[in-house]
C-alpha cells in the first residue's frame, strides 16, 4: 500500500 499508516 502506498499510503499505509497502519503497520
Curated annotation (Swiss-Prot):
Annotated positions of the D-allo-isoleucine modification: 5
The protein's name in its UniProt record: Conophan vil-I'/vil-I'(O2P)
PTM section of the record: Occurs in 2 forms, vil-I' contains 4-hydroxyproline at Pro-2, vil-I'(O2P) contains unmodified proline at Pro-2.
Signal peptide annotation: none
Modified residues (4-hydroxyproline): 2
Entry comment describing in which tissues the protein is expressed: Expressed by the venom duct.
The keyword Secreted appears for this protein: yes
Additional free-text comment from the UniProt record: The mature peptide does not contain cysteine residue.
Localization, UniProt: Secreted
Major place of residence: secreted
GO CC terms in record: extracellular region
Similarity comment: family membership: Belongs to the conophan family.
Keywords tagged on the record: D-amino acid, Hydroxylation, Neurotoxin, Secreted, Toxin
Function, as annotated: May act as a neurotoxin.
Record bears the keyword Secreted: yes
MF terms in GO: toxin activity
